[in-house]
Amino acid sequence: MVASPHIAHFFVTALQQRCSVITNPANGETVIIDGGGDSDRIIQWIDSGIGQADDEIGSFEGERKVVALINTHAHFDHSGHIPYLKEHYSLEWWLHEDDFFLQSLAQESGRRWGFSLPEPAVAENTWKHGEVHTFADMEFEIIHTPGHTLGGCCLRLIVDDGPDHLFAGDTLFQGSIGRTDLPNSGGDLELLLRMIRERLWPLDEDTIVHPGHGPLTTIGQEKRTNPFLNDGFRGRG
């Protein structure tokens, strides 16, 4: 577990996807989640302290060393600049294997949205639901939540002196949920709703949710107010 991690958010691409840069204050080791764009800006901030994050939680003064690149899922706005980050930091990439097929589609998908992206990255490492992986001496529980994509995951950062942090990708948003109608993604609305209820609702209510887009929220707030998860909304496949 980690005490008081420093978390910086960068909202990247025209889709304003949240890239999270998490630093262990005990050693400066750093993890990047969902490096979808603006890699030059993020690298400059990490390596040289030049520029600003879009928002920050906690504080850290010192040098950072990036030790892991991990992703909630493989849609292009979350993974499009992973090739640049992999090359710059000489690191392997972690992604659920059920999203491996999406890697090859990232460049084409981005082009349809008007983005110019490099050749797609290839993930060398994968994980399974319920595993706990240690990066930068910080523990992340892998919570597989298919429905937006086949391999979509939420990553729970376990914190020993405060609420945990859930990096939810496009599974859960403030007042909403991820789309299930995107092509070639394996979207399934009923499955997504079930995964949220079965795998996210049991988390502590003060768990801070970092969605892939939009403002932060908590598990408790979404359990009480998210209109897609109340008893009156059943969804359709």
Tell me the role of every PLM-derived stretch.
Residues M1-H6, R111-F115, A136-F140:
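Short Pro/Gly-enriched beta-strand edge/turn motifs at strand-loop
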